[in-house]
Each structure stands twice: as structure tokens, then as C-alpha cells.
């Protein structure tokens, strides 16, 4: 058994430790930006040291490219390594428009530039791109070549007006989808930012938009995302869904509340014949609810939708919609993740319509006659095969849509509660991406949650005995050095990569880093990462098609006792024993930091050959996340301390400290600068710090030094020993210097 003796002769050096009491879960592994880079599982790209507001707007896995919009630039990055072979097009706003923007009082840095906000695939060779154009939106076609090997990336056409396709203000989000070379956008259509619209443009048919200045349709919306989603087997029944939040007045018309909403329209809607001409005749919307119900009844709402991710399946009706929500309250702050079944969303849109009635304009379910075809039905679909266009809709259908676009029922998440709730944290969630992972014990959903502090949390959803799923934070990664909020996020299950953008650049991160969990089977099993398993030699990537017998993995329970038999589990019962000295009536610190913050720590004390007993914590003996702090050390504190970590019912001893208490008077005499001993009087004049002794000598050398101290104390009254001690001190100094120089040779040079 290895012993390391730490002899405390001059004071006790203690780092200040902040103990935080928080019920919020912590990541099992936290990697800083530099630590993440050292794992060789990330890449970073930026055009310059200046922030350029990067947004990942399109991912093309067929051509192995991701397309990024930023201030005055359009980027094409290699999907396999974003730092290799980047292509860029410089596309600034015209000088005249920039000057006009400044004259209008807009921000020269964050407003008066061409911030690219729309990149959509137009055809096999071209992209359609739009930018804010210094508060004068512009669009153009960009040639990207037929194949990625062509290395073509250039604007080969004239710019055209982007009005109705991109917002004037770059700080107001624009969402868009391209269907059959037609662009569907959600944005603000005017310079002042008062006319919000869902618009179809770039079409050979007539342009169509939402009813203008009609708060029943849109009320100061902030668009979040847009998706095309099938509805049944007939392609004519497909809908475009827009996710947004809007400000709605309460029944007293005195205050405005933020509600999250889903709206949908039919792509083949051409507007009405006599009413709603060039306006959507299939526009419907419903409220999206993400709330927590307290035990005493009231609901706490996470009102503000921040991001949406669709986890698609072979059957569109089983698609899951993940949403990030935050609170709008200035008192109660938090984030939540809610999950919705697409079938539940479609059920609400097929349900009753909302109707305002009475002096207080209370919302009730519409009880009158519903016209045929049902409002919101697409022409030419399964229910209206004989109506080829919305212009054939009866007038009462169009009138009904204009006055009743809102559904009565709200859309609630699975189990009517959030999957994840974070309250009282120093961050909030901003973006989400989800991967479906096959593990040895089942299929799991892994969430990648971007924060406003430039980190990404990797969270696995765990099934529980109840109807509510559990969750475990596997990792938290600093993907940006300056903690810039994450603005966009794309995931590639095919490439097993995550792509993240912020104001300062773009980062690429692997979905897994199995080797960082440890070099033992138990470490790999405790990680509970569905991407990773123990292969008999190391923690490595798990492939469901491989030989399962040789793979050890337990995501659901994370129990090494059942998975790691035969892999030296007994080694976890023992730990190297060290000897540590403390001075009576002083403070000392017994260090013990588990690998995982999710592990619970218990301290046991064994005196002589007695049984181990749990250390009683009080104001004098305090347990911290880094160890045990003992204030005003007493003789009764002496003994063998065992630091036991427990995680998922698996216990391991991670520290054994033989703590010995020294008499304070003896230590004071030994270190007295007026002492007649040459050794003691020389301590203050040493050219090195006393704590250097701890790392400078081996165990055998420290034994020799201890013996030397003992002999010196016994002979201090003999006058002829003074000269000998001076000589021995010279040898001691030379030995320390030689050991320190050897240590420096093994260290990296300071930067």
C-alpha cells in the first residue's frame, strides 16, 4: 500500500470553497472550450475576430455542406470538418443603403449591414438567399454547382427586392421553407416593423399573405420556425406549420400576455374569389401550452417559445415535436422542454373553433353551423377531391375563416407536463436538437440543448415506472470560448455531428466522446451514455449491429455490478492510503472529489481497529463538493477517513486519508524564527515555498527528512551540531533545486 506523508510545518493552506445548495441537476461531465478541443472531437470556424452574427440556415447531407448566413457573408462549410475547405461569398449591402440606414437612426454595427437570414435550396444547382440589406431586404440566386466536388460558390444573377421574403430588421427573426420553387416566409414586411405576415412569394401563381392588420390572425408575432408536414397519404393535404409567439390582450384589454402558437396553411391555397382575395383561406392557429401544475392547483406557464425540433418517423402521425420554452415573468425565471405528439396537434386543428361572446369577449366553443368544406381543409385533397382551388370555396367558408381562425382547444404536451424544467439557474435554453439512439437495452432520445451561455447540454431521456419520463445530463460542453448565446443548431445523425452557431462563429461537435468517461468498465457503465459501451478493453462507440455479448452497457440503470463482472470491480473497493497531518486548533481540508457530481459522498471514520462510523457533520466539520473541511482540529478528529462515493447504488472508495493531529505548541516551537535551531530559523529564509516539499521528494526521501528532523530536535542543545546542520541544509537546498529542475523538464512551457 502506497503511503504519502504530508508534513505541515508552516501554516495550513486552504482554498476557499463555495458550497452551493441547488436542487438543479448537474452534468456528469463538464468540458471547457479548451478541454473539449483536447478531446479531438470538435472543430471551430470564424471568418474574423469580429462578431458577424452567424446563423446555420441549411444543411445538405447529400452534398456534404452546411450553409451559413452572417453579416455581409454567405458561407459553405464542409459537413465533415467545418474548418476545411470553407467557401464564402462577400455580399454587403450597397453603400447608399448603408448610409440611408444610418440616417434613419439604425444601429450601424448590428443593423446597417446585409445580415443573411434566408438560405433555401431552389434547385439542384442553385440556392435562394435573402438578407436584410441594411433595412432594405434583398434576395438573389447563388450557384453552388451540381456536385460538392465542383467547388463552385458564386452569385450569378442580379439582386431583387426581398420585401415579403425577409424582415427589414435583422434582429427580428425570419423563418422560411421552399416548396416546389415557391418560398413561404414568416416575417415583418415593412420598415417600421408593424406589418407581420406569413407570405408566399417567388411563385408563378398569385402571391398570398395573411389578412393585414387583423389581430385575430397575427398579433405582434415573433416567428420561431416553419416546417412542411404531411397530413395523410394525399400530398395535396400537406400543411405548412408556422411556430411563433405573439402578444395578446386579456379580456379586460388592459394588458398584453405572450402566448406560444402554431399556425398552419395549405401550400396550394390561392386565396378567395370575392373575399380574402390574395389572402390565405386555410389559415388556422392554436395555442401551444407548456406549463407545470402545482399541487394546490394553479398552473405556472412557460409562455415564450424559443425553438422547435421535429423528430420524424416513418409514420408522420407519430412525429414528435420538441419545444424550448422560457418564462416571460420578471419574478419567476426558468426554461422548460415540452414534447408534443403530432397526432394531438392535428386533433386540435380538427376540433372546435373558438368564438368570442358577451361583453367581456370571453372565448367559448363555437356552437353554430360549420360550413362545408370544413374551414382549413386543403383543395384537391382526400376530403375535397372535386375542388381544385380555394377560389371554388363557398363564401361562407371564407367568411368563417376570416372571423374564426383560432381553435378553441389548446395543444398540451405528452403527459400534460414538461419533460425538463430548469428553475433558478444562471442560464436559459435557446436551441434544441434531438437524436434517436439504439442502445443494448432499448431506444433512447438524446437531447442537445443550447444555452445563452454558449454551452450545449447532452441529456438522455430515461423511462421510469410512472407515466413521466426521467432525464439525465450526460455532458455540458463549452462550444464557444466567450460564452456567446447559441443562435442556431443543426444535427446530423448520419455524420454523428452537431453544428452550432453564435455571434462569434460556428462549432462542430461529435455526438459522443466515449473515451473521456474513464479506462474501466465501471466508469463506462456509470456514464449511461447510449452512444458508448465497454468493449472489454475501453469505453468506445456502441454499434447495435455488432457483437452484443462483448459489449457492456446499461443506460437505464447504470449498474456496473451486473455489467462489469470479471473486470476487477474489487479495485473500486480500495484506494491508495495517504497520511495527512493537521495542527490542533487550526483548520485542515481532506480532499476528495468524485469524478461525477451526480455521485453522493459519505465520509466514514475509523479509529484504531474500531468499526468505521459515519462522520457527523456540524458547524465545525463541513462537507463540500471537493472534500471535508475541519475547523478547529481536535485530537478526537484523528483516525482513518474513508471517502465513499455512491452513484446508481454502486459504491467505491475514492480516498483513504490517515489523519494525524499535531500539537499546536510543538509546531509553534519548531517554526519559531527565534529558535536556536538553525533549521527552524532558516525556514522563513528559504528561497522556495514550504509546500514545494510535498511534491519534491519521494516516499523514501521524505522518511529520511522526517528522521533528520527528529534527530535534530534531540540534539539541538549541542553546540557542535550547528555547523553540521548548516551543511545539511545546503545539501537539502541542492536536492530541492535538482528535483524542481527535473520536474520543470517534464512540464509544458508556459504560454
Swiss-Prot record:
Recorded GO MF terms: chemorepellent activity; semaphorin receptor binding
Subunit structure: Interacts with PLXND1.
Compartments where found: Secreted
Keyword field: Developmental protein, Differentiation, Disulfide bond, Glycoprotein, Immunoglobulin domain, Neurogenesis, Secreted, Signal
Domain named Ig-like C2-type: residues: 571-655
Signal peptide boundaries: 1-21
Gene3D superfamilies in the cross-refs: Immunoglobulins (2.60.40.10), ligand-binding face of the semaphorins, domain 2 (3.30.1680.10), YVTN repeat-like/Quinoprotein amine dehydrogenase (2.130.10.10)
Function statement: Binds to plexin family members and plays an important role in the regulation of developmental processes. Required for normal cardiovascular development during embryogenesis. Functions as attractant for growing axons, and thereby plays an important role in axon growth and axon guidance.
Name of the featured protein: Semaphorin-3C
CDD domains: Ig_Sema3, Sema_3C
Species of provenance: Pongo abelii (Sumatran orangutan)
Domain Sema: residue ranges: 28-511
Disordered: annotated span: 712-751
